[in-house]
């Protein structure tokens, strides 16, 4: 641990990922990066999410992606962030689709969500740290973060 930041092992990262259900999918779409919040589960050492046709599928299917999930433990006032980098693939084999449909994937947004995407990781990394008291940053810093020149 350096400067109050603890680098997490892959096992610790997966354990933390299992404690939350929403993460952010980062993909390249046409000529720019984009980020989408998605509900997900950890399954067989990978990340699985359910979505409908559209930009997420177009940007993710078959591509290298990044996926991030974070959380805060109010009891210890420690926060964590886990990043999974790897290839995203549509789940298309019938037995895999059936198995995926039985996972506890509950999207927040209504609408058809008949596509399952699995991110197979190349790299899993994470950090845990103590959350700084807001007074550390002072009133000026808070004001500047909400205004634009």
List the predicted regions and their residue ranges.
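Short, structured beta-strand-loop surface elements
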Residues: 53-116, 121-123
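Short, surface-exposed beta-strand-loop junctions and turns on beta-sheet-rich folds
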Residues: 31, 55-57, 133
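Extreme N-terminal tail/first-helix region
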Residues: 1-18, 138-139, 144-145, 149
């Amino acid at each position: 641990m350096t400067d109050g930041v603890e680098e997490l092992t892959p096992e610790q990262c997966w354990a933390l990922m299992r404690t939350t259900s929403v993460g952010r999918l980062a993909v390249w779409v046409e000529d720019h990066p984009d980020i989408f919040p998605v509900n997900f589960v950890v399954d067989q050492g990978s990340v699985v999410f359910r979505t409908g046709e559209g930009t997420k599928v177009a940007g993710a299917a078959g591509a290298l992606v990044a996926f991030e999930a974070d959380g805060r433990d109010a009891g210890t006032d420690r926060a964590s962030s886990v990043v999974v980098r790897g290839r995203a693939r549509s789940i298309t084999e019938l037995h895999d689709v059936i198995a995926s449909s039985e996972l506890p994937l509950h999207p927040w947004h209504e609408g058809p969500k008949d596509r399952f995407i699995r991110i197979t990781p190349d790299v899993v990394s994470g950090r845990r740290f103590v959350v700084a008291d807001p007074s550390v940053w002072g009133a000026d810093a808070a004001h500047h973060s909400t205004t634009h020149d």
